[in-house]
Amino acid sequence: MRLQRYAFYLYQPNFFRIFCILSFFVILQKFESMEANTPERIILGIDPGSNVMGYSILRVVGRKAECTTLGIIDIRRVHDPYLSLQQIFVEVSKVIAQYLPDELAIEAPFFGKNVQSMLKLGRAQGVAIAAAITHDIPVTEYAPLKIKMAITGNGAASKEQVAAMLCRLLKLDATTLPKKLDATDALAAAYCHYLQTAHPMAADKPYRSWKDFLTKNPQKVK
């Protein structure tokens, strides 16, 4: 009898509407509570360069990613090659101190025909990695091809195409982006890391110390 009475009220239009609304708010509250308890991750993305180095900060909570900072480190005014490396270390350390990232995602140098340019780029990347490891931040490298594939699905995508896709994915205003695409390349590295770590089996193993980096990359210190 009680069950029949309950069913009678349930199928009344007003009662059913109120029941659905209350159920919706209960479920919504549970999801908000779960999201509030999800730990925040801050990913620092870096696009290494011997003249201009791009960096970005990606804030991740659960499955939501948000770009909070985009910028460049301009080393062109420092003409001494060794002092420019020092400047990279100092500036990357400042970014780390300001934003307190949990992880670093950095683009690996590409292999080109100009050996001198490759050497300079490799040094710049190594110094940025050293700055992160000095602050106990795990580092993960991603090849340019892998980053482009993760963002656009095309390993031959241009910098402009990568930037445009990031604007769509992260709802960024293209008119507010830095003119130098090194910044969006850095964001691409960070977003690639976010996607890869969402599927741990596909992610590259991070470097957790300078010794770990040297062990896995002996060719970079010859």
Annotate each PLM feature.
Residues 4-6:
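Short N-terminal alpha-helical targeting/association segments
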Residues 8, 15-18, 24-222:
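Phosphate- and other anionic-substrate recognition elements at nucleic-acid/protein interfaces
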